[in-house]
Amino acid sequence: MLLADFLKQSTSRLTKLYGEQEARAIINLLCKARFGTSTYTHIVEPSYKVPEDTVSEELQRLEKGEPIQYVLGFAEFMGQRFRVEPGALIPRPETEILCCEAIKYAKLKTRTINILDLCTGSGCIAWSVATALPNSRVIGVDISEKALSIAQNQNFKIPNPPSFIKGNILTDNILEGHKFDLILSNPPYILTSDKARMQTNVTDYEPEIALYVPDNEPLIFCQAIADLSRRLLKQDGIGIMEIHEELGNQILNLFKNKNFENTEIIQDQFKKNRFIRYSRSSE
């Protein structure tokens, strides 16, 4: 089949679920991964043909709403290809800002940096900062054995790969005796009541344990991370956490009341309140 025809037909199959623009983007990702084509191949090479039968099963999965990243088995993040599958949250582009802020801070230091990644999931944050900071020591923590298996088996060869441990940050007294220069986290923060307004490609496929917090305890993970940071963060260390865009002021006040200094909100590329940055007080 001509690539141009394949793009048109396949996009049409997904348009009802995603809208035309997002459907086209998904099909372009599929074609790039499976056929090695670019966004413009069908224009510069009008006679270019593709073996459409080889992706028929994957198209059916996409039609059912399965995320393209799970279908392909990978997601692009921080310029690298991460293994993803059901059981770990798919990395989002906005989370790259958290990594960039952490790397920028760490590069100001001349010593070895100790970094903790809470709710590590696929390990995309842990691996990204470890790759950019070859002299760092990175530990990732997650409650899910499935997520930890995915994180541990990312295919990167770097001098100091992250280590990963199982832990429940809400109940476990993790990493007693350790101190960290950086504590990073992308914890669950979506209100359970928001689920009804979300796309089914998220709600039906990505792990609920990595997404949702109870409506009556929206700051449950923020509280736990603040308490852990009081115990595990070095005096001159900082924390960066991804947050719910509508709860920024509440989270900011929580950390201020815990006597953290230099607390501030960082916006994402869409000008939404997406992260909080904080540092230990000198007391």
Q: What residues fall within each predicted segment?
A:
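Conserved AdoMet
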Residues: 29-105
